[in-house]
Amino acid sequence: MKQIYEFAVKWGEKFRDPNIGYIELVDDYMADDCASLGFKMDCVHAFSEKYGEASNKHDALVRIIDEVTDIPLLGSAIYSQWRYFNHWAYSGAEILHPENRAWFILALDRLEYLSRKNIVQSQL
C-alpha cells in the first residue's frame, strides 16, 4: 500500500507542475509504475460501468469521487485514462489541458487519500 501512496504523491506532483512537458506525462514511466502496482489497463471499462462519465470527465468525477473506495479500480482507471492520451488521443499534449489535468489530480488525490487511510488502519 505504501507503494501506491508514493505513486499517487509522485504523479499528483507531476500533474500539478505548471512547467512540466507533456512528454514527461505521456511517456511510458507512468505505465511502468501502474503495471508494477498491479493496475490493469482496461480502457476504463470497469470504472465506467460503475461511475459512467466520471471515467473521463472531471466535472462528473467531482460529483462521485467520495463514493470511490476501490483502490485497484481507481488505479486501473488512472492507468487507462493515461493510456488514452499516450496512445489514442489526437495529440498527447491534450493531457495538459486544464480539464484533463484536473481529472488526474482529483483521481490521484483520492488514490493518495485511500492508500494513506489503508496504511494508517493497518498500523492500528
Predicted features along the sequence, with ranges:
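Short terminal alpha-helical segments
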Residues: M1-S48
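Short, charge-rich amphipathic interface segments used for partner binding and complex assembly
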Residues: E94-Y113
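Short intrinsically disordered terminal tails
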Residues: M1-K2, F47, Y113-L124
